[in-house]
Structure formats: structure tokens, C-alpha cells
Amino acid sequence: MSDPEDKPSRLHAGRIDGGSNDDNGLIGAPADFVRGALADRDPLPGTTGFAGFLAEAPIDDGTEPALVRDVLGRQPLFIDRGVEPGGTANDRLPRWSTDPTDLADPKPLPAGAVLTPGATMPWWSLPSPEPAAPSAAQAAVDRALRGVVGDLRASPTDDVAVAFSGGVDSGVVAAALPRAPCYVAGFEGCHDIAAAREAAAAMDRDLRIVEITHDDLRRAIPAVAAATGRRNAMDLNIAIPLFLVAEAAAADGFDRLAVGQGADELFGGYSKVVEPATDHRVEADTVRGARDETVATLPVQLERDVVALRAAGIEPLAPLLDDRLVAAALELPGELLATPAERKVALRCAAAEYVPAGVAAADKKAVQYGTYVSREIDRLARRNGFKRRMDDHVGRYIDSLCRESMMDDHSL
């Protein structure tokens, strides 16, 4: 595999809907570029993710029509379990879409997979390199981040806003987009709004606050559940703040929302990777192994986040999931991922070139807690008779809102 630092990222974005397999239909990268990645089996060819249909995909010794999804699942792609492929040369695959609501019975294509008329095959897998020496590993992250920031600063960004929580991830993304307004969502008094205000002042940035109310939650819960196909409390607690930020940015006329997704997984941002040998939440007993477990969760998480953002009318842009940063992160030794004193060590060091020291060092709460969304959905559930003594009281409340929303839709 050639050096990802030599591959400028293809910062393409957009949404496609499947159905007709007559032409190439790809999101995230040009067809010829993806064909090259298929032919080379290169998992990190220099994109921020791709998915879709290729009329002629180079598979083994020939070419076939195929559906593809990148190795980290950064672009979702769904197939319909209930529709059999057609019989013509250009209609030999199941019905598919980047939006699960287009399909009667959607199932995600696995990350890194290729689906041909004959089979679904794992095609790409993430590299598993040995850890590099600390100085070389840090230099690689520095170079990769410099390339990503440089590409963003050189690209047209008048249609981009930034989801901004005041931490190092969103701080670096905002620094790469110096003219973009920053948006933060949360309930009054929450951690994320306070941190975003402090960071925006330090960076001299325009901050727009989306103050969430209980009415917003009652409206957003069924909307996000319908868009993502998920009703569990954890997924909705995470996706709803993103959805509400995206709605606000879209209402202000922005087409894209830049997010910091992926940094915690790639760079050791979770507490469970610090001392994994004594942490029941991971199976690995090394920092690198625990980090790899969190990276493996990205495809499922990104399906939720990308679909929720698109449901709000905006296209996500996730520069910290650029192949160059992914490749550099995978070579980090454990000491540059997480220690008892600091998490995301290498990323914070690299970010110091772009953000104030306080932003580079800032602690970040998980979005569901930092915005108070998890707390307030629980409060709403209890106010509506779903007490904590009940099994899955929040899930039952979510189901009740979704049923009410469906009944309202049917009555129109």
C-alpha cells in the first residue's frame, strides 16, 4: 500500500438514492478512483469514505456490477432484504439506497464489503501495523492533520457550518474552516454549551446556540427513530443533539455540517481504553487492542449519525475520518493514545498547532451527557408515567412517542 500522506483526500459529498443500476452511483469518491481501490485492495486509498454502485467493478479476473462500502463504513449503504434481484445485465443486484427509509426491509451492507450478483464478499480490512516509534508516530499524525487542514482551507466552504462542543475534535475542525459559523446544542446550563462558549471566545468564532426544549425532544425522538430505524435510548440520546444542530444549520442556509466524528475511536478518547486489563467494558488487555475494539464500532455508529444528519436536511463532513489520519492513528503506540493522565495524546499534541492550549487540552463529555439530552429524556419518561422501576422505562416512552407520531401521520 502506498503512503496515505501522498494521497490528497477526495473531499466529495452528496446523497444518492438507489433503484436503477444502469449507471454508476457513488457517494464520496469518483468511480474510477474506487475501481482503483478495488483492483489494488487498498483499504485507505485517500478518501473520507465512499459507498454505492459500480456498473463495472474489477472483481478478481473480470468485471461485474457491484455495490461497495468503504472499510470504515463512513458512508452508509442499505440493501432491501425483501426484493429479489432482477434478471437483466444491469439489474442483477438487490434494490439499494443510502437512505434506509427508501427500502421496505433495509439491511446495511457491511463495511469493507463488495456485493456482486453472486455473493457478498469482505474485500477491504483495516491494516494492523506494528506500533511505530513514538517520535515517528507523532510526526505522522502531525503531517496527516496538516494535510487535512490544508485541504479544507483550500476548498470551497461557504456552505459549511461546524458542530462545535468546545473540545479538541470540533476545535480542530473549526480551525480548518475559519469562516464557518459554529453551532452547539443543549439544554440550558449544560456542559457542552458552557465549553463551546469558552472555546469559541478563545478562538474568536461565531457561536450559534441551539437551546433544546422538551418540545424539541418530543418532536425529534420519532423523527430520528423513523430516519435511522433505531428506537433504543442510547442511539437516540446520541443522534438527537446532532439532528437538532443540523436542523438549525440547514434552516440558516447551510448545506454541510462539519463534525468531529471518529477522533475518540481512532485516537483513544474513551476512558475504557486507559486501563483495559481491569476494565470490563473491553475484551483487550492493551491500550492499542482496546482502541481497535472502539474503531470496530464505527460503521454502526456512523450509519446512525449520517442518516440522522441527512434527515435534518444537511450533508455531514467528517474530516477527522480522512484516510491519512486513519492510517497515522493505527500506527500509534499505546502511550500516544491514552494514559491515566491524558487521552487522545497524539491528537492533542498535533492540534496545538491550530487551537489554543485550553481547547487542545479540554475534556469532553459524551454528547448525550454533555447536552443533558439523556437526563431530560429520562425526566420526560418519568413525567409521562414510565417510572424507573419499570423495565426499560425510557425505551417504553420512546415507543409511545413513535406510535403517537405514526397515528398522527395516518390521520393526515
Predicted regions: what is each one?
Residues A55, D105, L115, C349-A350, ...:
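Polar low-complexity intrinsically disordered regions enriched in Ser/Thr and small residues
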Residues V355-V367:
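Short, surface-exposed acidic
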Residues M1-I209, H214-D215:
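Cysteine-centered catalytic environments shared across enzyme families
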Residues P134-Y354, G370-Y372, E376-R382, H393-L412:
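ATP-dependent adenylate-handling active sites, centered on carboxylate activation for C-N bond formation
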Residues G18-S20, W124-E130, D279-D285, G313-I314, ...:
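Charged, low-complexity surface segments at secondary-structure and domain boundaries
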Residues R81, P100, E265, K364, ...:
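Short linear motifs in intrinsically disordered/low-complexity regions
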